[in-house]
Swiss-Prot record:
TM stretches of this protein: 32-52, 90-110, 116-136, 186-206
Gene name linked to the record: petB
Protein name in UniProt: Cytochrome b6
Family matches, as HAMAP family: Cytb6_f_cytb6 (MF_00633)
PROSITE patterns for the chain: CYTB_NTER
Cofactor binding remark: Binds 2 heme b groups non-covalently with two histidine residues as axial ligands. Binds one heme group covalently by a single cysteine link with no axial amino acid ligand. This heme was named heme ci.
Keywords: Chloroplast, Electron transport, Heme, Iron, Membrane, Metal-binding, Photosynthesis, Plastid, Thylakoid, Transmembrane, Transmembrane helix, Transport
Cofactors named for this entry: heme b; heme c
Length: 215
């Protein structure tokens, strides 16, 4: 094993990377509330894992979506557990995200030179809410359908471009298969990729700038 490690160490400088990760200075004022961001990230990992598992059985069609969710809950081994974990970790992620935003704001973590870290964080908050909006409609039950109809109808109040935005979101004039397909695509591909890129940027800036000092 020593030779294998030495081979990788010579090429990747693993020890230097490990030292950089483990030797960052942590200010003495840091408390448990500074862990909320990490909890939010943990919830996201659970979302990715459980969501990926459910994509094997979920069918994004208006005729089969609800039945496929029922199948996951009643027929798939531990399907009920995966969906329950997905649902509860989604709620926990939103809650932790809100608490994290409040913690950063109240402790002044958004001030110079961390403005861009704050911007990426707020953008991540918008992405998180978008996860909730798109995922809520995927079972395509009565609640999901009407929630989708209401949410996609909101932009209609915008002058000039309102109707175009509604049709862009729905994929049609009315809510239907095109809408469900777009929500599924956004929920399982567009938003996860956006979240991953934003999180990587967010974490790199935190590593570079460190934790903000006390007020």
């Amino acid at each position: 094993m020593g030779k294998v490690y030495d081979w990788f160490e010579e090429r990747l400088e693993i020890q230097a990377i490990a030292d950089d990760i483990t030797s960052k200075y942590v200010p003495p004022h840091v408390n448990i509330f500074y862990c909320i961001g990490g909890i939010t990230f943990t919830c996201f990992i659970i979302q990715v894992a459980t969501g990926f598992a459910m994509t094997f059985y979920y069918r994004p069609t208006v005729a089969e979506a609800f039945a496929s969710v029922e199948y996951i809950m009643t027929e798939v081994n531990y399907g009920w557990l995966f969906r329950s974990m997905h649902r509860w970790s989604a709620s926990m992620m939103v809650l932790m995200m809100i608490l994290h935003v409040f913690r950063v704001y109240l402790t002044g973590g958004f001030k110079k030179p961390r403005e861009l870290t704050w911007v990426t964080g707020v953008t991540l908050a918008v992405v998180t809410v978008s996860f909730g909006v798109t995922g809520y409609s995927l079972p395509w039950d009565q609640v999901g359908y009407w929630a989708c109809k209401i949410v996609t109808g909101v932009p209609e109040a915008i002058p000039v471009v309102g109707s175009l935005l509604v049709e862009l979101l729905r994929g049609s004039v009315s809510v239907g298969q095109a809408t469900l397909t777009r929500f599924y695509s956004a929920h399982t591909f567009v938003l996860p990729v956006a979240a991953a890129v934003l999180m990587l940027t967010h974490f790199l800036m935190i590593r570079k700038q460190g934790i903000s000092g006390p007020l």
